[in-house]
Amino acid sequence: MEPVGRKRSRKAAKAQLEAQVTAAQGATKEGSGIASNFPGQPTMEPVGRKRSRKAAKAQLEAQVRAAPAKKHTGKDPVRDECEERNPFTETREEDVTDEHGEREPFAEKDEHTGIHTMKLEHIAADIKKGLAAKREMIKIDKAAYRKTKNTIERALKKKQLKRQKRDYRHTRKLLNVLKEYIAEKQKDDEAEEAEAAAAAAEAAAAAEAAAAAAEVIVVEDEEEEEKEEEEEKEEEEEEGEEEGGGEEGEEGGGGGEGEETEEEEEEEEEEEEEEQIKAFQEKQKRWQQPTGVRSWRLREMKPLLEQLLKAAKDTKDNYCIISSSEESELDN
């Protein structure tokens, strides 16, 4: 399908040629002196002239048909056809005339194609302006996004730094409190241990004194018993000498009763010593119980203290790293 402009140009050229032919025919009619044989009818032209006019008309039509072929010689027919069919490459600068050879008035839009006749340069300029505006908007959006992102990151870093500082202060305070508590606890334990040792020494001394006193008492009792036995023996000997053999039997029975009383006294003394030893052992156990509990508590507190010291050291290292990074950012 050919473009509309070319069709019109061909029609205009054809109409112009027909007008020239009719003008030539009129000139021949006026110049011929042959009258018409019928009234009211034009004069007949000679046969030779008719043939010459037909030949001239055919020649002109052949020239008109050959004109587009000459125009497109040396071009790619497929590409040329695409260019002819492309409505965006057409312009209104072609010579557009109607069938009577008059130029049609210029219109904003082509009635047949419906394509805006604005120049491609203006369209390209508008497209470039729109793209430039879009690029500027994208740049502005990117700058605003970076700014907000940096502000948010700074706020988060400040918040994290404050939190770490607060944790570091609390850990330091807790460490000081724990150290003071452990020191006081150790002092109390040492004082209690000293008191317990002094009490144990006193109890041991008292037990030794009691044992020594008991031994002295036992020795004195034994000495007294020996004296009494000697006196009794002397008395018995004297009585035996006086009274004779019957009384000797009675003296033997009295000696057996004295031995039984001595055995009972020894058993009572042993029981008293055992009771004193048991009481002393119970007192030692009572004194040793609080010291054992305190030592157990101290053993439990030591690993907790070590863990706390380790955590404080880690927080201190983190605080130093963050403060150094913040200083470097401020320098940059």
Swiss-Prot record:
UniProt name for this protein: Protein FAM9A
Family membership: Belongs to the XLR/SYCP3 family.
Tissues and organs where the protein is expressed, per its UniProt entry: Expressed exclusively in testis.
Comp. bias intervals (Basic and acidic residues): 74-91, 98-114, 276-285
Ranges for region Disordered: 1-114, 186-293
GO BP: any one term: meiotic cell cycle
Ranges of biased composition (kind: Basic residues): 1-13
Signal peptide feature range: none
Residue stretches of biased makeup (Acidic residues): 218-275
GO cellular component, one term: synaptonemal complex
Superkingdom of this protein's organism: Eukaryota
Annotated keywords: Nucleus
Biological source species: Homo sapiens (Human)
Biased amino acid composition, Low complexity: 196-217
Subcellular location: Nucleus, Nucleolus
